[in-house]
């Protein structure tokens, strides 16, 4: 229910005023739960008023996000009585020409970046007058890309600002070290040593190594510099890249982290979303959590994926956990979600911010916790610190027991009134 004179609605309307003043062209970087979708709704309502016969196109990266607009009962189009709106998943959109008054690109990070061809196609295939790009967070290369197209920042609003305003639940990001067992530690150490042996060829410079992977001419330049044959440099490129993939896959499937995610979820018994980088890991977690858990990943049919989301949202079922592999980082909202757990990750800040956003929707009395499980003294720890740079409310713990103590202490302080949770 939208309150027309609430501080949030007044702020959202001010964002639209800034957008119009900028020629009705620009992007907003607004955290999940603060109301970025309603800013899109306001832009559509303005277009409906000024151009009642003109079409509006919304481009989204996934069916989940499309459903948020088109659902016959709870979609934004239905709830707000929007007219002349058509919603497209981006892969379908770029297959044909389009003509509209307003083009909205939701989760624009999927169509922007130094190497992105998708944004070019969306723009080139669309004749439009107004452009609004929505996202919760962008990395620097996305911003540079958009600025190059003359798409400027209209408004930035962070999760901490949302908490301070009382629009999001207070939260903590708790980083918990999970050790490798003896056999896995030996395996990782050998793998990492082999990686570094070949990395030395490129002066331990990731950019040089990746340039050699993608640019054959640069390999020749480096071979001349080192006094090597091209065959030898090609072998180093192959072995470095191969060992990087092996190390990554190993860290994506660490059994001790998967088992820790299961134990923590069972112990805390909060409504929980679990994130990882492998379907096998997501499957194992779902199986261990039993009937209380559903899955969501790319190997499922669209029908089954939608059904599983419905089971989690429906308070009448026993389902309270969802295990996801490279999915649900965006476009999935459930105010009751209180706990997030990441058991494998990449180094990208974008993914970490989006996953955190899944648990921050405001719910009375809720404090949200996001648990980051990592293997200390490995590349996984470096990925963790990279992904959490500039993140607020981050605590590095020593053990799972310390995690339990923090949450129990918070509960006690809420009950005795020491912590004021709205």
Where are each of the predicted segments found?
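Inter-Walker segment of RecA-like/P-loop motor cores
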Residues: 63-99
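Conserved segment of the helicase C-terminal RecA-like domain
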Residues: 358-387
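Conserved interdomain hinge at the start of the Helicase C-terminal
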Residues: 183, 187-196, 245-288
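Post-DEXD/H (motif II) to motif III coupling segment of the RecA-like Helicase ATP-binding lobe
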Residues: 113-171
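Walker A/P-loop
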Residues: 23-43, 275
């Amino acid at each position: 229910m939208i309150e027309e004179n609430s501080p949030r609605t007044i702020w959202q309307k001010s964002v639209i005023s800034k957008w119009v003043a900028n020629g009705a062209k620009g992007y907003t970087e607004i955290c999940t739960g603060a109301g970025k979708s309603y800013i899109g709704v306001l832009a559509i309502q303005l277009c409906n008023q000024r151009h009642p016969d003109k079409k509006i196109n919304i481009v989204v990266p996934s069916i989940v996000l499309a459903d948020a607009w088109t659902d016959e009962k709870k979609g934004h189009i239905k709830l707000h009585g929007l007219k002349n709106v058509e919603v497209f998943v981006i892969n379908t959109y770029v297959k044909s020409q389009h003509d509209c008054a307003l083009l909205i690109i939701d989760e624009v990070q999927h169509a922007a970046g130094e190497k992105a061809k998708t944004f070019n196609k969306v723009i080139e295939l669309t004749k439009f007058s107004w452009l609004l790009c929505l996202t919760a967070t962008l990395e620097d290369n996305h911003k540079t890309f958009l600025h190059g197209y003359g798409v400027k920042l209209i408004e930035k609003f962070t999760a901490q600002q949302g908490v301070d305003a009382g629009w999001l639940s207070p939260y903590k990001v708790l980083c918990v070290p999970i050790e490798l067992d003896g056999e896995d530690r030996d395996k990782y150490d050998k793998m990492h040593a082999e990686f570094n042996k070949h990395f030395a060829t490129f002066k331990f410079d990731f950019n040089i190594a990746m340039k050699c992977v993608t640019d054959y001419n640069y390999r020749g330049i480096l071979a001349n510099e080192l006094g090597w044959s091209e065959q030898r440099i090609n072998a180093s490129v192959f072995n470095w890249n191969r060992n990087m993939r092996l190390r990554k896959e190993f860290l994506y499937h660490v059994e001790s982290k998967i088992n820790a995610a299961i134990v923590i979820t069972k112990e805390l018994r909060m409504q929980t979303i679990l994130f990882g980088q492998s379907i096998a890991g997501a499957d194992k977690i779902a199986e261990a959590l039993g009937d209380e858990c559903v899955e969501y990943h790319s190997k499922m049919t669209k029908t089954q994926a939608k059904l599983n989301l419905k089971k989690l949202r429906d308070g009448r079922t026993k389902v309270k956990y969802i295990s996801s592999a490279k999915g649900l980082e965006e476009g999935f909202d459930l105010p009751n979600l209180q706990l997030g757990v990441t058991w494998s990750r990449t180094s990208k800040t974008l993914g970490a911010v989006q996953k955190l956003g899944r648990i921050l929707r405001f719910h009375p009395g809720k404090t949200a916790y996001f648990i980051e499980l990592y293997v200390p003294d490995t590349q996984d720890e470096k990925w963790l610190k990279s992904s959490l740079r500039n993140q607020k409310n981050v605590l590095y713990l020593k053990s799972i027991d310390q995690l339990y103590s923090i949450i129990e202490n918070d509960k006690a302080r809420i009950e005795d009134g020491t912590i004021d949770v709205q």
